[in-house]
């Protein structure tokens, strides 16, 4: 399903192994996908810029709001996720903290412990939602932290 078209940039030392799986995921690309790839690689260089700016705005808004509440955050430069340390003085059990938050404020984050033992005490959230949704989630988080 989907476009089934892919491109890998990797150090030569890895390509021999990568090609073993990559070739089966993207071979026999349909004509429409091939034309789309040509367009993207020749004329689409800046197509993602408006969305990139939007994601940066969302990320920075969340970081500002959450750090003001005491969360520790290392600013992400990759995908659209934030991994934030739960402030001292709050339940450090990420599952318990977020279960209570979800029950009281109807907002879902992912417990850091879901990513292994070193994730305990952290929460993960996505900023792939609209700014309106993000603002509402941050408002509810602020209310929750004040009430806890």
Functional labels for PLM-detected ranges:
Residues 1-148:
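PLP-dependent class I/II
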């Amino acid at each position: 399903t989907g476009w089934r078209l892919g491109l890998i940039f990797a150090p030569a030392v890895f390509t021999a192994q990568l090609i073993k799986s990559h070739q089966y995921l993207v071979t026999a690309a349909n004509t429409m996908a091939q034309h789309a790839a040509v367009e993207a690689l020749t004329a689409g260089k800046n197509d993602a810029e408006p969305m990139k700016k939007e994601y940066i705005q969302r990320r920075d808004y969340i970081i500002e709001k959450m750090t003001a509440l005491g969360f520790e955050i290392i600013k992400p430069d990759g995908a659209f996720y934030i991994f934030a340390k739960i402030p001292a003085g709050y339940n450090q059990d990420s599952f318990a903290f977020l279960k209570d938050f979800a029950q009281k404020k109807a907002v879902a984050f992912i417990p850091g412990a879901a990513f292994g033992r070193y994730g305990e005490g952290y929460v993960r959230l996505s900023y792939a939602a609209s700014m309106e949704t993000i603002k509402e989630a941050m408002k509810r988080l602020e209310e929750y932290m004040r009430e806890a």
